[in-house]
């Protein structure tokens, strides 16, 4: 039974990480109900599960990873964005862990995220065409993207939703926005996993005691394989220039699911 739960948790991570619906919150909710985890432990586990998604990104974007140290602009982008993500995100993670111990409800920010996605979809649909390329980003714009990614440490706030939306608002074309948002995820996620091990490794130890090392490994592998499929699918959609349809759909889902969560709680 635990194996089936591990696979399901991995699939949830593998799908939700690359969609603007906050994977850590989906994992939080799923592990809370499937494993009976305390909300704060479930939040930590959701961040820890990014190990599988890191694997997906490293495999899918392996050519980009190889050229990082040969492409000064790409290296600068990753350094600036990752640094700001850490500066903003680590304190928010520590604060969030405390809030979740006091019955913080992640459905609340999910509602705001859903509304923001719908508004972003409207903005994208009716605003000027996004034709700027990634290489045209300024340092100030990289800082904004890093701050946006750092804010996503909060429960209910989507990392990909924050970074992709920020780049789209800056006029970056959808294909580049998705591509480099996913690439920026790699160092940020490594930092997230490291942060959980540094500050809340006792939470991870507790989950291991429930489903075992083999259960954790199965969940991570499931997340990795699922993520590879989802990344490819979303990048194909980004090429069609109809990203606003994703925003409308996921924004509506986020609002409905969050309202249901509030009613149930």
UniProtKB/Swiss-Prot annotation:
Q: Does the keyword Lyase apply?
A: no
Query: Which cell locations does it reside in?
Result: Cell membrane
Q: For this protein, what is any one GO molecular function term?
A: undecaprenyl-diphosphatase activity
Q: Provide the E.C. number(s) assigned to this enzyme.
A: 3.6.1.27
Name the predominant localization. Answer: membrane
Task: Give the record's GO CC terms.
Answer: plasma membrane
The way it spans or sits in the membrane comes to: Multi-pass membrane protein
Which reactions does this protein catalyse? di-trans,octa-cis-undecaprenyl diphosphate + H2O = di-trans,octa-cis-undecaprenyl phosphate + phosphate + H(+)
Q: Which family does it belong to?
A: Belongs to the UppP family.
Listed PANTHER family: UNDECAPRENYL-DIPHOSPHATASE
What NCBIfam families does its record include?
Answer: PRK00281.3-5
Q: Give the protein's recorded name.
A: Undecaprenyl-diphosphatase
| Organism this protein belongs to | Saccharolobus islandicus (strain Y.N.15.51 / Yellowstone #2) (Sulfolobus islandicus)
